[in-house]
Amino acid sequence: MSRYRGPRFKKIRRLGALPGLTSKRPRSGSDLRNQSRSGKKSQYRIRLEEKQKLRFHYGLTERQLLRYVRIAGKAKGSTGQVLLQLLEMRLDNILFRLGMASTIPGARQLVNHRHILVNGRIVDIPSYRCKPRDIITTRDEQRSRALIQNYLDSPSHEELPKHLTFHPSQYKGLVNQIIDSKWVGLKINELLVVEYYSRQT
């Protein structure tokens, strides 16, 4: 299944706020109206919608998300918590959380077009897994910095999470540590996502 490129407002109207996909917000009460029209949700649908929220927020294909779930399942600790850490430490998401892009698709475009350096080297893989002490900067070129400055000049969409530090005058971000679950940028019940996939196998 390919990455979603359709109308973004349609998704947030059904699933709620997805800040990684769009800065727009669903109108208040739209979720309640949708729920009243559709009646009581089944447990399957509840788990499916949580999975879809995760997929659309981080801009993943179904295959990519399944791969992350499998990696998280083999790691020590809570599968759901590890899954969120893996997704939050992706380079495209780190750029978004630093405020260097207004959405995760926008951040992915910066990476694909080779505007971003990690520890002084160009990285053009949006799924690159960032680590503590990684330094994220832009190329020292006018066009690269102008693109980032456009995002920095726009109203900030959220507070900078504590696992990151950003120096706007230098266009430089620092990964201080692995993200704590309370700083994840999406309201999500990750256990329902894990349950969804466990019932598919």
UniProtKB/Swiss-Prot annotation:
GO molecular function, one term: structural constituent of ribosome
InterPro entries from the UniProt entry: Ribosomal_uS4 (IPR022801), Ribosomal_uS4_bac-type (IPR005709), Ribosomal_uS4_CS (IPR018079), Ribosomal_uS4_N (IPR001912), S4_RNA-bd (IPR002942), S4_RNA-bd_sf (IPR036986)
Segments of this protein annotated with the region Disordered: 15-44
Every S4 RNA-binding domain range: 89-150
Biological processes, Gene Ontology terms: ribosomal small subunit biogenesis; translation
CDD domains: S4 (cd00165)
Range of residues in the leader sequence: none
Keywords attached to this entry: Chloroplast, Plastid, Ribonucleoprotein, Ribosomal protein, RNA-binding, rRNA-binding
Species assigned in the record: Calycanthus floridus var. glaucus (Eastern sweetshrub)
SMART domains: Ribosomal_S4, S4
The gene coding this protein: rps4
Name this protein carries in UniProt: Small ribosomal subunit protein uS4c
Function: One of the primary rRNA binding proteins, it binds directly to 16S rRNA where it nucleates assembly of the body of the 30S subunit. With S5 and S12 plays an important role in translational accuracy.
Oligomeric and partner information: Part of the 30S ribosomal subunit. Contacts protein S5. The interaction surface between S4 and S5 is involved in control of translational fidelity.
Localization per record: Plastid, Chloroplast
Protein family membership: Belongs to the universal ribosomal protein uS4 family.
Domain of life: Eukaryota
One Pfam family recorded for the sequence: Ribosomal_S4
GO cellular component: chloroplast; small ribosomal subunit
